[in-house]
Amino acid sequence: MEVKICGLRHPVQAQAIAALGFTTLGFICVEASPRYVSPREIELVLQSLTAHDKLSTIGVFANVSLPKLREFLAQTSLNGIQLHGDESPDFCGQVKQAFPQHRLIKALRLRRSADLERAEAYYNAVDVLLLDAYHPEQLGGTGQTLPWQKLQQFRPPLPWWLAGGLTPSNVQEALNLLQPDGIDLSSGVEQGPADKDLAKVAQLRAQLDALAILQH
């Protein structure tokens, strides 16, 4: 199972997180977010991680135009794109065509379990679906969990990741109920926006080791 630690900003923290075995790292590229990082800040982090190979580095965008996305990515060496806004399946397909070398993740923010019906429209447009909790004012990192029991029948024909309020304290409960292909944590392992709590990240590693599911 893949584990993404999202909302990184500080090179030293990113190095420590990678050293713990977390090789999927997320960077918030939405200017309105308190976790926003500029292309230059992202590159400073990535340059500090050259000792770690096979990293998956994902930029998180929301409702960005294709030209703006192209401009941002041209300034970084990110190898993944996460769309976390109201992007249509058609737009996702355009992004996939424009950036075929980048893994494309589409986040669906669920207000109710019936919102899962929207997922099918994205099956052929993206590489990964991510399920997150809906918040009217925040796109992610809200600390709110999804109703895990209601997701037990979700079996899309492509990889899917679970997000939304995951912490070292509840990750085992979530994974005892569900079998996602990945999980995504942000606020659950930080002490402030984009300021990761390395003790919590280590606790997360210990919890996942107990389940023997962390992908190496």
Regions from the PLM with identified roles:
Residues 1-216:
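Conserved N-terminal beta1-alpha1 strand-loop-helix module at the mouth
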